[in-house]
Amino acid sequence: SPEKVQQALTNAYPQIATTLINEFSSDNIDDIGADNIYSNFLTRETAYWQPILEYNNVDGLQNIWDYHYKAIGQANAALDAIETTLHNDASLNPAKGEALVARAYAHFCLVNLFSQAYNPNTSSSDLGIPYITRPEEEMNPQRQRGTVAEVYQQIAADLEKGLTLIDDSYY
């Protein structure tokens, strides 16, 4: 139903922030951990490019990965419902657009955190992340990692298509 599509879209956004881990991976971190009131093992491991061994940290890498792919799964479930069950009902175009944009956003966050930064000279060979466009139908499927360039092309395609479908009538 359209209501269930909207409910799925409510969860199509990552329920975790990546700002902390991104900040620690930048050159903005202080040299002395005592100056950082949020200093902990994750902070030190990330700032000094050491393996991250603290597994129970809410903002840890595994949770960031999981929450973003859960959001992608919700966006894909909404898209699948619109395309199959609701037969591409035109009144749901704004919801379809939102799902495409939400999927692009989550992939954008992941490729920025888990892949090399986009470089036009190397992006066609740098490993990206799996770009998931369909709901999962099997447990733990093997996913192919495209290149960074391919991931950005898919992000751009989702954004371009999604933005043409979004309007204020749905909201």
Q: Model features per residue range: what roles?
A:
Residues 1-29:
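Acidic, glycine-rich segments characteristic of secretory precursors and extracytoplasmic regions
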Residues 17-23, 38-39, 106-118:
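Secretory-pathway/luminal and periplasmic proteins that interact with or process carbohydrate-rich
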Residues 29-35, 95, 101-102, 132:
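Acidic helix-start/capping segments at beta-turn-to-alpha-helix junctions
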Residues 32-56, 131:
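Short alpha-helical hairpin
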Residues 45-114, 142, 146, 164-170:
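Conserved, well-structured interaction surfaces
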Residues 72-75, 152, 159:
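Inward-facing hydrophobic residues that define packing positions of alpha-helical scaffold repeats
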Residues 113-153, 157:
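Short coil/linker segments at helix-helix boundaries
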Residues 157-164:
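Glycine-rich, acidic and aromatic/proline-enriched surface loops and short helix-turn segments
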